[in-house]
UniProtKB/Swiss-Prot annotation:
One of its GO terms (molecular function) is metal ion binding. Destroys superoxide anion radicals which are normally produced within the cells and which are toxic to biological systems. It comes from the Bacteria. Signal peptide: none annotated. Homodimer. The lineage of its organism: Bacteria, Pseudomonadati, Pseudomonadota, Gammaproteobacteria, Pasteurellales. The gene is sodA. NCBIfam families: PRK10925.1. This is Superoxide dismutase [Mn]. GO terms for cellular component: cytoplasm.
């Protein structure tokens, strides 16, 4: 088995004017593809690791030979993070139901949640990700550096939790369209959050059947 670049499930221009076609195409077909290629090359002599769920491998990187561990953390992390990111994007969905209720419960209001998420994304120094996670039954906003993920746990990533959705704040995710205006890119994100997918992940995890991918 080898890792494969996932289909987006929508056209590169489907998220315009918020996320532009050129950025989406380069981001998916070049940047994400590179993470896939590098992960396959790193693990080609370890078929037993390629057979594992990528998320499960990232949760316990001690399974990876020490000399390859950092490279797998970065590249397989990039593959898994981007796969979740693409699934979490769609126009025309609405925050509602159990996820909305939980956001209000844990943050006080939807507006307070959005402000906290925007702050986490804007203040992540350099490259990284902002996340909405479920941790011990409670929603939280966290951020990670580089291609780290909350699924790696606190010892590796500094944070933990089950990802509900994420935002890529690497410059390659927005620079062609937004240049150095990261806050504008972050605010545009709310127009393309796939709340249906976020709700599905939240409800499945609440029911005890969510899979870390």
């Amino acid at each position: 088995m080898t890792y494969q670049l996932p289909e987006l499930g929508y056209a590169y221009d489907a998220l315009e004017p918020y996320f532009d076609k050129e950025t989406m195409e380069i981001h998916h077909s070049k940047h994400h593809q590179a993470y896939v290629n590098n992960s396959n090359a790193l693990l080609e002599k370890h078929p037993e690791l390629l057979e594992k769920c990528p998320g499960a491998l990232l949760k316990d990187l001690t399974q990876v030979p020490a000399e390859k561990r950092t490279a797998v953390r970065n590249n397989l992390g990039g593959h898994v993070n981007h796969t979740l990111f693409w699934k979490g994007l769609k126009t025309g969905t609405t925050l509602q139901g159990a996820l909305k209720d939980a956001i209000i419960r844990d943050f006080g209001s939807v507006e307070a949640f959005q402000a906290e998420f925007e702050q986490a994304a804007a203040t992540r120094f350099g490259s990284g990700w902002a996340w909405l996670v479920l941790e011990e039954g409670k929603l939280a906003v966290v951020s990670t550096a580089n291609q780290d993920s909350p699924i790696m746990g606190k010892d590796v990533a500094g944070v933990s939790g089950y990802p509900i959705f994420t935002l890529d704040v690497w410059e390659h995710a927005y620079y062609l369209h937004y240049q150095n205006r990261r806050p504008d890119y972050i605010k545009a994100f709310w127009n393309v959050v796939n709340w249906d997918e976020a709700s599905r992940r939240f409800e499945e995890k609440q029911a005890g059947c969510g899979c870390t991918k």
